[in-house]
Each structure stands twice: as structure tokens, then as C-alpha cells.
Swiss-Prot record:
Signal peptide feature range: none
SUPFAM superfamilies reported for this sequence: PRTase-like (SSF53271)
Keywords linked to the UniProt accession: Glycosyltransferase, RNA-binding, Transcription, Transcription regulation, Transcription termination, Transferase
Taxonomic source organism: Ligilactobacillus salivarius (strain UCC118)
NCBIfam families given in the database record: PRK05205.1-1 (NF003545), PRK05205.1-4 (NF003548), PRK05205.1-5 (NF003549)
InterPro entries per UniProt: PRibTrfase_dom, PRTase-like, PyrR, PyrR_bifunctional
PANTHER family cross-referenced by the UniProt entry: BIFUNCTIONAL PROTEIN PYRR
Protein name: Bifunctional protein PyrR
Length: 178
């Protein structure tokens, strides 16, 4: 049984608030680039970029990162398939840029650590911040998000499901028992 945490409108409000926080913390959007972690992080990054364009009247580049090659927890049942090795599709240089890494859910921190490794293999950004729609706790590594849409404390037998219209045909966040 799933419990709805956010509907489409609440999710839109959270992303808008995160966008304002990004602008405020960075005193504008100079040298800012967004990098979404596949799959849902890419769509969330694009939505933040669209909102930045509306608010600041400037384009912010959006790239995507597939970190499956870098994961150190392949023994996990959810990654039982052979990993797909894809190049990072940034389309821009991250050297001396302020990178906002975007993902849907922050859990153990392992995906983010892997994404940081991948980014550092690509180039040397001036700064990296982390934006996540949901922080569910249970960190295994010392990683913290700078911009959070919603903190959702969870039990280990629960799962946070983020839905984006581009992939799932709807927007929303649900909490499910495993």
C-alpha cells in the first residue's frame, strides 16, 4: 500500500522553492550548470533550469550523468542486471563552473559519492552542490544535500517512489512498504 506524500502541485512548489534557494545561495546564476543523475534527476534538473530561465531570464546548461559504472554496491539486488556503461552527456565543460548535482532521492549517499567520482573524472569544477527532491535519511556516507525539496524520515522497510511525468506519466511522491 502506497501513501501519497506529494501530489503534482506540491512537487512543483518544492522544485520552485529549491530554485529560489539556488539563486539566493549563489547570488545569481553566473557559471552555474546543472547535472542530473539518470533517470529522474535529469528531468528534475531540466525543470529547475526551466524555472531559472523564467526567473533570471538566462539559460543554464543541463547535462546528465549515468553513474552505474561507478557504483560500489553492485551486490545489491536492485542492480542485478549487468551495468550499462554510458558516457556522461554534459555538452559543456565543468572546469571552474559551479555544478548543481540533481537527484530524486538521497538515501545512503552511495549514488552521490559515485556521481562525485564521475564528475571529478570529467573535470575540476569550482564548486559542487547537491539538490535532491527527497532526503529520506539512513546515510552510510558523510553526504548532505544543500537543497532539499522534502525531508521524509523512513524506516528501512519503506521505499520512496518519485514519479515524473516524462517517465511515469504523472508527478508525485509516494511512500511504500517493501
Amino acid at each position: 500500500m502506497a501513501k501519497q506524500i506529494y501530489d503534482s502541485m506540491a512537487m512543483k512548489r518544492a522544485l520552485t522553492r529549491m530554485t529560489y534557494e539556488i539563486i539566493e545561495k549563489n547570488k545569481g546564476i553566473d557559471d552555474l550548470v546543472l547535472v542530473g543523475i539518470k533517470t529522474r534527476g535529469v528531468y528534475l534538473a531540466q525543470r529547475i533550469a526551466d524555472r531559472l530561465k523564467q526567473l533570471e531570464n538566462a539559460e543554464v546548461p543541463v547535462g546528465q550523468l549515468d553513474i552505474t559504472l561507478y557504483r560500489d554496491d553492485r551486490h545489491d539486488a536492485s542492480l542485478a542486471q549487468d551495468p550499462v556503461v554510458n558516457e556522461a552527456d554534459l555538452g559543456f565543460d565543468i572546469k571552474d563552473k559551479h555544478v548543481i548535482l540533481v537527484d530524486d532521492v538521497l538515501f545512503t549517499g552511495r549514488t552521490i559519492r559515485a556521481a562525485l567520482d564521475a564528475l571529478m573524472d570529467i573535470g575540476r569544477p569550482k564548486k559542487i552542490n547537491l539538490a535532491v527532491l527527497v532526503d529520506r535519511g539512513h546515510r552510510e556516507l558523510p553526504i548532505r544535500a544543500d537543497f532539499v525539496g522534502k525531508n521524509i524520515p523512513t524506516a528501512m522497510d519503506e521505499q520512496v517512489a518519485v514519479y515524473v511525468d516524462e517517465v511515469d506519466g504523472k508527478d508525485g511522491i509516494e511512500l511504500k512498504k517493501l
